[in-house]
Amino acid sequence: MKKTFTYLSFIIFLGWFPSLFAGEIYVSLQGNDKNPGTKEAPFNTLNRAIKQAREWRRLNRPEVAGGIYIRLEEGVYAQRNSLFLRPEDSGTPDSPTVICAVDGAHPVISGGVAVTGWKRGCNHPAVPEKLRQKIWSVEAPLIGNRRVETRQMWVNGHKIQRAAQFPDGGLERMIDFNPEEQTITIPVSQNVNPKRLQNAGQLEMIVHQRWAIAILRVKSIDVKDGQAVVRFHEPESHLEFAHPWPQPVIGGEKGNSSFCLTNALELLDQPGEWFQEYPSGTIYYYPQADENMETAEVIIPALETLVTIDGTLSRPVKHIQFNGITFEHTSWMRPSYQGHVTLQGGFPLLDAYKLQEPGLPEKAELENQAWITRPETAIRVRGAEHIDFKHCTFRHLSSTGLDYEWAVTASSVEDCQFTDIGGTALLVGAFPDGGFETHIPFIPADVRELCSHITIRNNFISNVTNEDWGCVGIGAGYVRNMDISHNEVCHLNYSGICVGWGWTSLESGMCNNRIEANYVHHFARRLYDAGGLYTLSNQSGSVMRNNRIEHLIEAPYATNDRAFYIYLDEATDGYTMENNWCPAERFDSNRPGKKNVWKNNGPQVADSIKYKAGRINQD
């Protein structure tokens, strides 16, 4: 009798609490999008699974009650267009949509395509006779009716250097930078032989300019008397020579600014270098000694954005979580089409110039103006709430990894790994772009436009900024109530964690941001005017505490020594800096406000604080 009563009670319990049971949708590389999406008969694509979940919600099906779990089986899910999530895909607090791995699987969402059919030997006249049998070539894959064009290639999981002067002996110092003539003069030497590059139609110059780089497509090279005068294509030529900050330095404390020539078949002379000729699409590669091109896995990216989550202020996308997913292989093609000249943090300039008479109503001493755009990103989130990434991996991405771009609230990135990323690992918040001049305080009419209550916690970020050296580990612009804590951020070419934008002392909505217990190390490897922890502008009620910052690298091509463990850049105000450990009190403040408070920062901070910084509960 007791057993019967228990059984009946359980049945009644199920009837009254259907929300305990979630709907499940399965995706497998062996599946079919005509299947019902069950474990036994899964779908083949994530797009189809998302559509199924959307329909369940539209029809208010019983499967929605306890949430929808889209489970991906093992495999690489190649995307040929960005996965698009919209307000109709929203979950609820009691019924989220979770995109996750089946138990024990490690699914990958990829924008890459395999490159196969390599042939040994290259008879191109740009290649010296002695190297022709060492170089392999292949036609790039076709997608649609076009050969894939790329600036990135991975061989057996390792990113390969494009053919460049750089691995042949490091960067070289320029001789002159001439804004009036729009030219850069470089030496002719054993390392730099511009004569043989005069017919290299895809040649680029990487210019080292303080806290940023420029990538300029070379238009012409005129060689005379041991020097070469280089001119560049538009629009980047105008931008490079018109924008005052940052420009290359001539006559710096440590010499002139540096440069590197890259992307020419004539430079393909070292193992581990490659070049793609366009419009033919042919790829040339000089393999390393341990690589067998008949069996090597070679991947090039064919997509810039893997996932787009796009809502509005009135209809945000809500309650979607990614758990245990790897995102990899995205491209970044902007420099190939229009060059790449940035203001700071990897943000490309649309226009910039020096004011003949300084001053704006918002900033009387301002001497320059700049309009920027946003870098490409693997995952873009706009107009959203409760969009969470947990235990995910972001790798082999060519620009930004993940971008909470606009009007995102109550969202988190936790226990994730970001490695081998060309730009910034994580971007958050407004960096006003388009027609909004970037030095004017951004004060939106609706405060919901500001990203708020974003948590970035317990993540590992390493080897990012490896294409655009001026990017950062974590970059936050106009944000409020942000929590950046217990992350390890390392091996960066510029700054580690950067919060703030605008160079303004005025109130703008940035406030109550927390940078706590992070471990930042091995930064400023190539650029300077950097900070392990870096801030800009007025951010009332913000704190920077219990962080550990060390291994500030003396960038070999810097023209001065401006790099710091903590750097409060222009107009930083409203911060309390407390109990931050670093091996020396190497700090700087650039025209700060009056409400900053410094308490016990430097090598004297207790080990009990120092060793608690960084990730916790590491896998």
Segments and roles (model prediction):
Residues 26-383, 388-393, 434-445:
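Extracellular polysaccharide-degrading/modifying enzymes targeting complex plant/algal/animal polysaccharides
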Residues 71, 84, 98-100, 108-110, ...:
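Extracellular beta-strand solenoid repeats
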Residues 20-22:
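Boundary at the C-terminal end of the N-terminal hydrophobic targeting segment
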Residues 59, 81-82, 331-337, 376, ...:
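Short glycine/acidic-rich loop motifs that flank beta-strands on beta-rich extracellular proteins
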Residues 80-87, 94, 98, 560-562, ...:
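Predominantly extracellular beta-rich ligand-binding scaffolds that present long acidic/polar faces
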Residues 1-9:
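Bacterial N-terminal signal peptides that target proteins for export
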Residues 318-329, 365, 385-396, 408-423, ...:
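Right-handed parallel beta-helix
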